[in-house]
């Protein structure tokens, strides 16, 4: 009887593997539910811990490009992770370079991949504030950011974004943000954007860049920024990190 159960599991897993590249929901189901839990069980480590080990083994300390390359290689060839990824990462790079922000905010640090991508492009004296709700993710991110040699450019703050955003002016001396990268809980995109507005943290010309607007999707956020006359928005089509599933980034300029 046991062999029958094992055979069914193998068949189901094989089907998921075949479909994960073409179906967004199946891709996320496979990567975030099945594959991740199997690896957690067999390695005794969490996914962020495995990513950190890959960085420490394959990247050059103090070299952000090698850290990015090590994570991309690991996530494309060994284990998927919810980083912005190499394809969308190039779009992120181009927007950050175009904006050349003096003040930058990231919502959702995770392991620090996009933090490293953004921070390495910032001008001297510019700091990136990145918010992370999960303390375990934050602990790994700090190590990866330090390994990249960017700890002096990054302020990582732990806690719920809804609690931390109103404290930006008082605790960090921020008048407004030139650039905001949204890559945290998708149901927080609209509330946190409104909170940034209410707290006066967006100025005329501030740029918001939102990830995963197609997969898993942020329909309410897209409706908000595309229909509000205070925003000028553009969609950048791409793929869900390390897959062939369609995803994209939404760039929205706040017009005041």
Swiss-Prot record:
Any GO BP: dopamine metabolic process
Binding residues for Mg(2+): 183, 211-212
InterPro entries: Catechol_O-MeTrfase_euk (IPR017128), SAM-dependent_MTases_sf (IPR029063), SAM_O-MeTrfase (IPR002935)
GO cellular component: extracellular region
Catalytic reactions on record: a catechol + S-adenosyl-L-methionine = a guaiacol + S-adenosyl-L-homocysteine + H(+)
Residues reported in the UniProt entry to bind S-adenosyl-L-methionine: 84, 114, 132, 183
SUPFAM superfamilies in alphabetical order: S-adenosyl-L-methionine-dependent methyltransferases
Tissue-wise expression: Widely expressed. Has higher expression in females compared to males. Strongly expressed in liver and diencephalon. Expressed at lower levels in hindbrain, spinal cord, eye, telencephalon, spleen, gut, gill and muscle. Detected in ovary and testis. In eye, detected in all layers of the retina with highest expression in the inner nuclear layer. In gut, expressed in the lamina propria but has little or no expression in gut epithelium.
Cofactor note: Binds 1 Mg(2+) ion per subunit.
Leader peptide range in chain numbering: 1-27
Its EC number(s): 2.1.1.6
Alphabetical keyword list: Catecholamine metabolism, Glycoprotein, Magnesium, Metal-binding, Methyltransferase, Neurotransmitter degradation, S-adenosyl-L-methionine, Secreted, Signal, Transferase
Cofactor(s) essential for the protein: Mg(2+)
Role played: Catalyzes the O-methylation, and thereby the inactivation, of catecholamine neurotransmitters and catechol hormones. Shows highest activity towards catecholestrogens and dobutamine. Also has lower activity towards L-DOPA, dopamine and epinephrine. Active towards the xenobiotic compounds methyl-DOPA, carbidopa, isoproterenol, and apomorphine.
Protein name: Catechol O-methyltransferase A
Taxonomic placement: Eukaryota, Metazoa, Chordata, Craniata, Vertebrata
